[in-house]
């Protein structure tokens, strides 16, 4: 995930806040160890005691079969798509509270939304899975998801009460078979089994790739089962979807489509038979569609309806899409569905559910990462979109990664997503909060009971089939490549094969509608009701015959069997028609569009394996390659109108009520079957997309941009109206559709477009990139003349074919009349064989001529459409030229502005020079005045010594105190008036200079004082540093002395230990001697008792001698004990001294470190 940037990608990107998770009680939680450092997505893991399972890191002990060898294998430790971060302003925006029992009287407006508080809630969580509809027990199952960088693996059960106005929650105990924590997975409810596949998880298979197991939850016994299919499996992925289709009453198939793994997108389609999951030979089957495959896509939605798969929206390598793709398993092919009405914008991470005949699309994230809360409905029968009107009361916030569940009372339950939706404390306050207040979360319900009134026509069922555009076209018509671009569609689709697609014949959907309503609204199956006993093990699972048996549509709702009538060059499937079905079908039939060649031919299954490019060419080439039976056949374009076109396809058709070609049909069908057997399995197209912004946005539906009414176009020249009368034998389809390569580059055939679509497209301007080439009038006239010649040739061929057919019919009538008239003339065997051969040859020629007529007619029609497109292009170019001519001449204005700018620049330079010269003159004058003033001052100083001058000047000068000016007496007033002015100016200047000098002096003194202060501080710091260094040296010396003392103490201790050993050995020796003496003393006493007794004196002497010896030994023993005690005390003292020295050493080291740190901090 990124994920998911899901590294989207997820580089998938969290909310930025970490609110406490209060979805279950605190007693059921406990924190676990953090994830390994190489894991990017699961950055937080928790394992509760019960009810909730979190990611526990990667496990390698998984045994699974290998994936298909075509896929590239990536390490799990690669970057993942992370879910996009939610802007803070979008989290706590909440609408007004809605329906509660005490607030019903306060509501004045109708709303389809309702909010419900869910206590003990599993939410918030993002990109989880939930069952699409409730069971007969009103239960909903929720598994996995992501919240606040925690990936969940718990399984919750929500039970609805009181008409879905109240819910209760329980959890399922975690077992060994429980799926590990995952996000971005897919699930579907099938009978009494809840099927889960894929997702971004830490579990890997034996090859180190992402988990590719299928997990089945028995919703009765709550036991998990993991099938073990043999052979290749779909690669583990996230952002995909799974769905089921019941083929028979006891057979259900699981389909997996799309998804991504990091930057690799998938478009493979795999199917697994759920009915055989217990068999040892169960396996995955990889489907290869016949003609067309959607682009690699992820984060889309897929539903099952009418035994078909319907895909909407999603993210491709080129951007988001809003198209509807449909897969029909009966013919094994994909189709692009042409829809009308108010189409949703391109969106991803939205949610979809089926309600009756409607596909409901809620929320999602658009191409600008804006979160949507809009609701759209697609009528799957009329193929028309409807948008739910906006009801502001109770509407949920825009969101993505949420889930939808269809309830029994025509309501849709919306749960989870990337919004917190925490409930508030007050009981009737249904506003949401971005802070967990321990009151659970808010879930939303959408009431569809009045959907017919809110969206008129949403439930309408079409009564007739769409009118075909061209009567000469049959069920399959090749589509011409086009290079036009459409502005209103902002997403291209990856390349796909240039091929035609059939449109299914109209059929009755009444039984299918009834069954779908029963499945999605009532959801009670006969087999499901019969299950009452619990299942506690997998053996019990095997005993249940209907674990994977959903409702089976009746035969009337099944798609009719499609028969292959040709295997080259397009391998186009057709529908076997009834005898009265004479109308031919348009490529756009039943709002089901044939894929345009703008998909390109690189998505054909054969090229998918070989092509490693992430972006496939979308422009048409001059050669169209189509794989058949392992070979590539080239279809050359028609260079000349008179060149013959070989017919390669024959169709089962009617001529005057007689069916032809039954034997040839069966032969062609056998060839088609052989081709299918030789084809290899389908694989996904994978491509790395480091940045999708670099791709230019295009779209496949580009030809409809220029489709407008002919009366609204001012054509430069009217094309010739070519109409060819269809004979009774018309009704065949052409096999090939070939046009000139020169025309193929710029134009494409136009199909009938619904009125709404026409009106919308007519208002959209044509992209200028598609009309940059100017069409020459000579080429236009050439094409016109060529069309005229083709018309004449076609008419001639048609007349020849009609005449030939009439001749054959005449001969046949004559033969029948001869036979009926009872003629006795007998025809020999050789003549009959020749006649039969000639008839077959003529029939073949007739068919060939009819095919050529149809091909030429289609070519003529396409040429007319091309001319119409060219005419529109020319008209658009002329209008553009006129609009450009009417625009003002900006070049002349620019030149005038440039000239004016140059003039102003020259004037500016001149003014600058004048200003510079004026400044220089002022400076020179000031210098002259200064020199004159200096000479004047020197002269005044010389005359100052003269006393008479001073006395006379003192009598004449008076000081005016009021104005501060000096007034000079009249005798010298006239002579010194000008000098006084100069002197006053110079005096003022001198005062200013003195003031500045004083200020400079003061600042200098301040700086000098600061300098001295800093110098003193530096000297004091230097002294402190020296003192610290001396202390450090002293400490180092003490440390060295302590080390030496410790060494000496250790040496003394070693000496004492050696002496102690000596004492021990000596003590042992003395003990041995004492034992020996005791033994000898005992022997002597025994001998003395048993021997002859001597006199009492001799015995007394012996006793005295023994006692003396014993006393001596006792003294020695006591001395040794004393020495041993002293030695033990000395040893204990030495140990205490060593411990004290160690403590001192540690203290010294700590002090040294502290001093060093202080010194470093002082220096800094």
Curated annotation (Swiss-Prot):
Gene3D superfamilies referenced in this protein's UniProt entry, alphabetically: Kelch-type beta propeller
One Gene Ontology CC term in the entry: mating projection tip
Record's subunit section: Interacts with KEL2.
Ranges of the Kelch repeats in the UniProt entry: 139-186, 253-307, 308-357, 359-409, 411-460
Sections of the chain in a coiled coil: 777-931, 974-1163
Residues that bear Phosphoserine: 20, 23, 25, 94, 503, 613, 689, 691, 717, 748, 837, 848, 958, 997, 1003, 1022
Keywords: Coiled coil, Kelch repeat, Phosphoprotein, Repeat
Other known facts: Present with 1350 molecules/cell in log phase SD medium.
Residue positions, PTM Phosphothreonine: 467, 477, 604, 626
Protein name: Kelch repeat-containing protein 1
GO biological process, one term: regulation of vesicle-mediated transport
GO molecular function annotation: identical protein binding
Signal peptide: none
Physiological role: Has a role in cell morphogenesis and cell fusion and may antagonize the PKC1 pathway.
Region (Disordered): 1-106, 550-589
Comp. bias regions, Polar residues: 20-37, 50-68, 78-102, 554-575
InterPro entries, sorted: Kelch-typ_b-propeller
Record's keyword annotation contains Aminoacyl-tRNA synthetase: no
């Amino acid at each position: 995930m990124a994920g998911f940037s899901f590294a989207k990608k997820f580089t998938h990107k969290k909310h930025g806040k970490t609110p406490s998770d209060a979805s279950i009680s605190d007693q059921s939680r406990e924190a676990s160890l953090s994830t390994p450092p190489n894991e990017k997505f699961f950055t937080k893991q928790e394992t509760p005691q019960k009810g909730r399972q979190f990611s526990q890191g990667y496990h390698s002990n998984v045994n699974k079969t290998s994936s298909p060898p075509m896929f590239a294998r990536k390490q799990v430790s690669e970057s993942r798509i992370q879910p996009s971060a939610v802007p803070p302003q979008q989290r706590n925006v909440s609408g007004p509270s809605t329906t509660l029992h005490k607030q019903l009287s306060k509501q004045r407006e109708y709303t389809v939304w309702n909010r419900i508080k869910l206590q003990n809630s599993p939410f918030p969580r993002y990109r989880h899975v939930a069952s699409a509809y409730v069971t007969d027990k009103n239960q909903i199952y929720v598994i996995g998801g992501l919240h606040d960088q925690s990936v969940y693996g718990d399984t919750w059960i929500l039970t609805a009460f009181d008409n879905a106005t109240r819910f209760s929650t329980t959890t399922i105990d975690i077992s060994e078979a429980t799926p590990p924590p995952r996000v971005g997975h897919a699930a579907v409810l099938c009978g009494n089994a809840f099927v889960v596949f894929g997702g971004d998880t830490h579990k890997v298979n034996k090859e180190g790739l992402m988990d590719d197991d299928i997990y089945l939850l028995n919703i009765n016994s709550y036991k998990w089962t993991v099938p073990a299919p043999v052979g290749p499996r779909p690669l583990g992925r996230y952002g995909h979807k799974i769905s089921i289709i019941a083929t028979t009453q006891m057979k259900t198939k699981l389909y997996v489509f799309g998804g991504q793994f990091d930057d690799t997108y998938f478009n493979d389609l795999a199917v697994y038979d759920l009915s055989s999951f217990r068999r040892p030979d169960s396996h995955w089957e990889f489907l290869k569609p016949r003609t067309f495959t959607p682009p690699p896509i992820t984060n889309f939605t897929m539903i099952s309806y009418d035994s078909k798969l319907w895909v909407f929206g999603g993210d491709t390598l080129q951007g988001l899409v809003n198209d509807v793709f449909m897969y029909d398993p009966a013919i094994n092919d994909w189709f692009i569905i042409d829809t009308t009405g108010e189409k949703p914008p391109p969106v991803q991470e939205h949610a979809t559910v089926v309600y009756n005949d409607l596909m409901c699309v809620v929320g999602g994230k658009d191409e600008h990462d804006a979160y949507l809360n809009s609701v759209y409905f697609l009528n799957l029968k009329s193929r028309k979109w409807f948008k739910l009107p906006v009801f502001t009361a109770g509407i949920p916030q825009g969101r993505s990664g949420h889930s939808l569940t269809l309830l029994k009372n025509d309501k849709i339950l919306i749960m989870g997503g990337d919004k917190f939706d925490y409930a508030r404390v007050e009981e009737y306050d249904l506003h949401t909060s971005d802070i967990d207040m321990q009151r659970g979360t808010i879930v939303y319900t959408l009431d569809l009971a009045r959907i017919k009134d809110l969206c008129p026509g949403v439930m309408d069922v079409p009564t007739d089939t769409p009118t075909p555009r061209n009567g000469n076209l049959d069920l399959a018509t090749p589509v011409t490549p086009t290079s036009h671009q459409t502005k209103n569609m902002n997403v291209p689709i990856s390349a796909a094969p240039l091929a035609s697609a059939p449109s299914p014949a109209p059929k009755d959907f009444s039984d299918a509608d009834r069954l779908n309503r029963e499945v999605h609204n009532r959801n009670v199956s006969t087999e499901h009701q019969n299950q009452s006993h619990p299942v506690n093990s997998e053996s019990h699972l095997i005993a249940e015959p209907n674990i994977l048996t959903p409702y089976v549509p009746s035969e009337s709702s099944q798609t009719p069997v499609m028969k292959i009538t040709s295997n080259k060059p397009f391998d186009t499937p057709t529908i076997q028609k009834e005898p009265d079905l004479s109308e031919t079908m348009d490529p756009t039939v039943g709002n089901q569009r044939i894929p345009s060649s703008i998909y390109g031919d690189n998505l054909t299954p054969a090229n998918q394996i070989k092509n490693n490019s992430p972006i496939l060419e979308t422009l048409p080439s001059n050669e169209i390659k189509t794989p058949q039976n392992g070979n590539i056949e080239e279809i050359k374009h028609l260079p000349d109108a008179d060149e013959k076109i070989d017919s390669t396809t024959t169709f089962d058709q009617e001529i005057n009520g007689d069916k032809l070609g039954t034997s040839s049909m069966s032969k062609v069908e056998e060839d088609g079957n052989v081709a299918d057997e030789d084809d290899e399995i389908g694989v996904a197209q994978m491509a790395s997309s480091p940045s999708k912004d670099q791709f230019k946005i295009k779209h496949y539906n580009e030809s409809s941009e220029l489709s407008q009414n002919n009366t609204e176009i001012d054509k430069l020249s009217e094309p010739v109206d070519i109409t060819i009368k269809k004979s009774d034998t018309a009704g065949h389809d052409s096999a090939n559709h070939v046009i000139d390569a020169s025309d193929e580059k710029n134009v494409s055939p136009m199909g009938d477009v619904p009125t709404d679509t026409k009106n919308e497209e007519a208002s959209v301007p044509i992209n200028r990139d598609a009309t940059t080439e100017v069409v020459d009038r000579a080429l236009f006239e050439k094409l016109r003349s060529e069309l005229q010649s083709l018309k004449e040739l076609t008419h001639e061929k048609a007349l020849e074919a009609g005449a030939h057919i009439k001749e054959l019919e005449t001969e046949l009538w004559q033969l029948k009349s001869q036979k009926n008239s009872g003629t006795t003339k007998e025809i020999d065997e050789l003549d009959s064989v020749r006649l039969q051969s000639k008839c077959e040859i003529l029939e073949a020629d007739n068919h060939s001529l009819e095919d050529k007529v149809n091909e030429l007619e289609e070519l003529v029609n396409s040429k007319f459409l091309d001319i119409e497109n060219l005419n529109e292009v020319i008209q658009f170019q002329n209008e553009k030229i006129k609009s450009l001519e009417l625009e003002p001449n900006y070049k002349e204005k620019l030149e005038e502005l440039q000239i004016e700018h140059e003039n102003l620049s020259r004037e500016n330079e001149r003014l600058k020079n004048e200003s510079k010269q004026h400044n220089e003159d002022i400076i020179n004058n000031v210098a002259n005045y200064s020199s004159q003033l200096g000479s004047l001052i020197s002269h005044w100083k010389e005359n100052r010594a003269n006393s008479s001058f001073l006395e006379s000047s003192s009598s004449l000068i008076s000081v005016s105190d009021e104005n501060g000016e000096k007034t000079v007496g009249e005798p010298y007033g006239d002579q010194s008036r000008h000098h006084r002015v100069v002197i006053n100016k110079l005096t003022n200047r001198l005062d200013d200079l003195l003031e500045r000098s004083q200020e400079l002096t003061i600042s200098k003194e301040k700086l000098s004082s600061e300098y001295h202060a800093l110098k003193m501080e530096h000297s004091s710091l230097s002294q402190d540093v020296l003192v610290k260094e001396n202390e450090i040296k002293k400490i180092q010396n003490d440390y060295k002395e302590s080390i030496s003392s410790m060494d000496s103490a250790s040496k003394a201790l070693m000496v004492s230990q050696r002496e102690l050993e000596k004492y021990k050995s000596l003590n042992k020796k003395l003990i041995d001697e004492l034992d020996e003496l005791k033994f000898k003393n005992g022997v002597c006493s025994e001998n003395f008792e048993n021997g002859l007794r001597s006199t009492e004196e001799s015995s007394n002497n012996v006793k005295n001698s023994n006692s003396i010896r014993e006393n001596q030994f006792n003294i020695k023993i006591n001395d040794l004990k004393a020495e041993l005690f002293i030695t033990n005390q000395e040893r204990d003292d030495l140990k205490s001294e060593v411990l004290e020295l160690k403590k001192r050493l540690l203290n010294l080291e700590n002090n040294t470190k502290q001093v060093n740190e202080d010194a470093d901090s002082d220096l800094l």
